[in-house]
Amino acid sequence: MSFALKTIYSPSPATTRGKPVVLGGDPKGNNFLYTCGNAVIIRNIKNPNQADIYYEHAQPATVAKYAPSGFYIASGDLSGTLRIWDTTQLEHPLKIELKVLSGPIADIAWSADSQRLVVVGDGKERFGAAILWDSGASVGEITGHSKAIASCDFKATRPFRVITGAEDFQANWFEGPPFKFKHAFKEHTRFLTCVRFSPDGEKVLTVGLDKKGFILDGKTGEKVGALAGGADAHALGIYSCSWSPDSKKVLTVSADKSAKIWDDKGTLLTTFAFEGGVESQLLGSLWQGDTLLAVNLNGDIFSLDQNNPKTPARTLKGHNKLVTSLAFDTASKALYSGSYDGVILQWNLETGIAVPIAGTGHTSSVTQAVVQGNKLVSVSVDDTTRFTPLNPPQYAAQGAKLDSQPQSVAVAQGKDIAVVVTLNSVVVLQGEKVASTTAVKYQPTVVRVSVDGSEVAVGAKDNSIHIYSLSGTTLSEQAVLSGHRGFLTAIAYSPDGKHFASADQNRDIFVWDKASRKIKVEGWVYHNARVTSLAWNSNSNNIVTGSLDSHVYVWSVSEPSKHIAIKNAHRGGVNAVLWVDEHTVASAGLDCSIKTWTIKN
């Protein structure tokens, strides 16, 4: 057997209210960059399904920028570490790692010749540094600020200039190399959030939380204009700006939920207004080629349409909290993913477009979800089970409230029956209401219902599998199976009804004969940490497993010694795996991404 990565369904940018989101543009015009968790996400601007993820930061990444040559990317993280790495090779070999600041890096700017960088953020000793790209040697001092620097930029034409904007309400001007402080621009009255030179180097725009934008001369740093409206250029703070490639226009985005295009003299040309609550505040922007991008607090990436300002040309959604569960609808071919923040998305696997389920849903982490006919059954840490119609996907008014926190959910296909295990009971729901509750002396961890709906397997903290018969809504315990050395973490019945597989905290994976309830296959202990999820192929022969060790394995029941390992499928751990079709596996994990893999026998 062999495997190949098919598609990456990327996470959305990590966001924090009141902090700008920095997007990095590709000098060749093909890709754009952002960060989520410890990862840097590289996405094709025209086809977002073409993506790559760089995982090598030890701390959450905060910003990434392409070198103008296009051959390297510089990325920074919360610890003040800067990594410069190769973009031309799939492995992204590291050029250099430098501890530049003692606190978070907020922004990075390259010189036009790709030889120098300015790195800014927070720290105890300094708020910024100007360095050579290949050695980290200093090429000047970024001084003159009394508080953390939020943004910086490098003039793309000679003579080189550097500008920084900080929380001390001022933008500082530097000339070099070596770069030295020249003067400060002090007309902002609140934090600066973004400073950007126009591509031709003639002008600079500075924006801040005072709702103002000032235009400075690109050679001297002297004020030459301002965005029309003064303190009312936007109704709330401006978080980001980005110039058009021809330097004649500039895009700004604001917490007032609008994006605006201005000419190079500050005259307003176009307004893009968004509706919604706080989550619709716009925090990031990028103008690359003919594509204008804006990012909101929710992490959604909008492609703005200048010809139709009322409707974005495209909206990219994803998770920016770890993905906890997956479910697949074989009828519609839609994939459903639930995350730690209670969000459930419906994915079109062909286009890569995700749509959130409408309405008010779970308020906390989605523990598990499964498709039953034309509805999605999900359980959450919020102590509810929800039955969500899928045509169209719309949350019902309320879910079924449970007495304690649900651990797992399973459904009887073809019947209106769902089984949920809580911390101390096994609950059968019918018609979306609790029909019976069976108190147990053990602590359940996982549940599955057999293909014919007659049997329920409950895995437990006592390292056992408790087998129940299911008649109507009544459960009767039939057997207790032992053999596992750790508590149960995953169970699944084979589609042909002849077997079931189980996995535990201690990495063991067993295949059981359903009729005799004897172990048929054992010895699958190749994972290095707890197995979190397992699923059967429709052929009832191959099993896929995911683990906290970050790996995905595919096993063969007919040839137990035969397996393939997808190493580091999701950095940090795999939370969910399933089969999309007989040759495609989907996986999700702590990196907030979903990936599909082609499996060849």
Swiss-Prot record:
Pfam families named in the record: WD40
Give GO MF terms, alphabetically: actin filament binding
UniProt KW keywords: Repeat, WD repeat
Which cellular component appears as one GO term in the record? cortical actin cytoskeleton
**Entry-linked CDD domains:** WD40 (cd00200)
Q: Where are the WD repeats?
A: 56-95, 100-143, 145-184, 187-226, 233-272, 318-357, 435-478, 483-522, 526-565, 569-600
Q: By its UniProt entry, which InterPro entries does this protein fall under? A: WD40/YVTN_repeat-like_dom_sf, WD40_repeat_dom_sf, WD40_rpt
Q: Name one GO biological process term.
A: actin filament depolymerization
* Functional summary from the UniProt entry: Associated with the process of cyst formation.
Q: Which family does it belong to?
A: Belongs to the WD repeat AIP1 family.
Q: Could you tell me what this protein is called?
A: 66 kDa stress protein
